[in-house]
Amino acid sequence: MTKYVAVIDQGTTSTRCMVFNKQGEIVAQHQLEHEQICPQAGWVEHDPLEIWERTKDVIHGSVAKAGLVAADIAAIGITNQRETTMIWNRKTGQPYGNAIVWQDTRTDIVCNQMSAEGGQNRFQAKTGLPLATYFSGPKIRWMLDHYPGLRQDAEKGEALFGNMDSWLIWKLTGGPGPAAVHVTDVTNASRTMLMNLKTLDWDEELLSAFAIPRAMLPSIRPSSDPEFYGFTRQDGPFGGEIPICGDLGDQQAATVGQVCFDAGEAKNTYGTGCFMLMNTGTEMVHSNHGLLTTVCYQFGHEKPHYALEGSVAIAGALVQWLRDRMRVINTAADIENLAKLVPDNGGMYFVPAFSGLFAPYWRSEARGLIIGMTRFINRGHFARASLEAAAYQTREVVDAMQADSNVSLKVLKVDGGMTANDLLMQIQADVLGVPVVRPKVAESTALGAAYAAGLAIGYWKNSDDLCQNWGVDKSWKPSGDDTLRTKNYAMWKKAVTRTFDWLDESA
């Protein structure tokens, strides 16, 4: 009997279930968006119960499209938006509030207070991360401080913290109920600011600094676990017992999906944000140029692989904003044709610092800026500048990564929804001055989670099996001369500096 691997890909704007075959090809998929809740400036939330309902719906839709039953599915992998934080009650399964999304900046006060006590990099040696609103630790602390009765429940082990992977695994394994499993993997745990990168365990010093009870935290497991996290339920959305044995944060999953298994290999994912990861092997490399040190993956009981990461908060989210808030376009795909109407940006730059700036600046007080406007500017320039924002932010991350690793980028592997935009990919090649390559399966995030689950059960034997599945769909070579490339990049950098200190009352 032919078997398949199913993946739940829980992202920032949508949830989908995808079914893969042994060749790494998509057999079926179903996707649904969920609401972006913005109760006040700087706050971004998701409803965990809505996401669970969407998850059940996409599982049913995908399995039905593939014409499969539970017995046809060998294993399940999970991949998720990282850092997004929720806390729920162990007995009732009810969240204490909406999930606080990774883009949310309400924890700025927490981060500033802790930075004042020991500097923004006070935990970097252990966590590889700067103190920033991006990560889960400050979000948990904020919830504990603001939700009545939560701290008491957390100390008794009745309140459970999780990123979306933990929440979905808990629900899929029967939560609330005695069989429910409360776990996460090393990649997601490495984004909390609470895990020690060397021990791969929760760190008591970090927990004490954030005043977070250990009893509320999930157990940390490998990204590909031959011992399985647990099994889906007969009465659950899959309709049978299937092992859940792969779990990675979305960007680490994409790195696995792009088969970046050797030190020095890198990929860039274009989704809600932009995220570039470079595999540094089994050795940690700490950044001096604003990048993050993170766990890349851990397969079974092997040593973990680490990565340098450059995180950009806003990429595809800018296109979504143009569609939903500004009504500049009707669909996200319209941005490409609109941008094609002009040969360049007309001197206009758009720095989308909606949630501050992430790598390499880490400036939470920065805010979005459009500069260089004249009466010559039209909707086409606006669209092109929006695409260029993703390309220029990626260039900044590449520069930092090359400085930290002393490795020059020869080619950029890309994936994610925005890579369907051929114009953006050409702009990216032009901005970087190196070729850009899109694989046959551009949805590398879900594929990476499938690989992790499949390796755990022997569906694929090893990384060599996975590398054979990778192939080029399309590539773009850089055009234009270096003088113009340097000039335009300098203008972008100048625009970025104008966003600094916007929320600084003393400025």
UniProtKB/Swiss-Prot annotation:
E.C. code: 2.7.1.30
Chain residues that bind sn-glycerol 3-phosphate: 12, 82-83, 134, 250
Modes of activity regulation: Inhibited by fructose 1,6-bisphosphate (FBP).
Species of the source: Beijerinckia indica subsp. indica (strain ATCC 9039 / DSM 1715 / NCIMB 8712)
Alphabetical list of SUPFAM superfamilies matching this protein: Actin-like ATPase domain
Name this protein carries in UniProt: Glycerol kinase
This protein's UniProt keywords: ATP-binding, Glycerol metabolism, Kinase, Nucleotide-binding, Transferase
Coiled coil: none
